[in-house]
């Protein structure tokens, strides 16, 4: 089994920007890219325009840069030269994909960009691969509307010192 070429990354974590069937697709004036490089500054600017910015280490630019560099799937949405949305995922591509961040600028929310970012993420996965996410409190009602089902057994440990 192989992955779509636009979704593969090399051993050095330099992501491919080879077009897929939907690469550069313009939907309602928004252009979507698979694994296009983003700077920590671009990403943080977007997150500051969303509720997700409250829960990410925006002051730690090196950490943000590493989060972007090590993402397996990074889908970005652009309105001209302006970054308006990102879906950042960690995955094995075959069984499960953890959608770590789904961010859409509040200026363009309710336009279908989040749904399209998720659809583009699925284009990078093998059939049958599940997408898993933890919803922000403000987004709990959004995900069922677009097809996600609630799962009641998620667990979180923020530091190894909590391990007993």
Spans of features found by a protein language model:
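A short helix-loop-beta-strand connector motif used in the catalytic cores of GNAT acetyltransferases and
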Residues: 65-76, 129-130, 153
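Short amphipathic alpha-helix that is part of the acyltransferase structural core
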Residues: 4, 17-61, 154, 164
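Intrinsic-disorder-associated, low-complexity terminal segments enriched in Asp/Asn/His/Tyr and depleted
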Residues: 13-15
């Amino acid at each position: 089994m192989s992955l779509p070429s636009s979704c593969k990354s090399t051993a050095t974590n330099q992501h491919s920007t080879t077009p897929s069937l939907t690469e550069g697709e313009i939907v309602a004036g928004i252009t979507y890219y698979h694994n296009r490089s983003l700077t920590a500054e671009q990403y943080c600017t977007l997150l500051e325009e969303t509720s997700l910015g409250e829960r990410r280490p925006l002051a730690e630019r090196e950490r943000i840069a590493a989060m972007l560099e090590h993402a397996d799937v990074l889908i970005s949405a652009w309105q001209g030269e302006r970054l308006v949305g990102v879906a950042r995922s960690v995955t094995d591509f075959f069984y499960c994909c953890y959608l770590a961040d789904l961010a859409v600028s509040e200026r363009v929310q309710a336009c279908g960009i989040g749904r399209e970012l998720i659809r583009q993420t699925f284009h990078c996965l093998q059939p049958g691969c599940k997408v898993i996410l933890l919803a922000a409190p403000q987004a709990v009602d959004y995900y069922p509307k677009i097809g996600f089902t609630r799962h009641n057994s998620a667990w979180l440990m923020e530091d190894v010192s909590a391990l007993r």
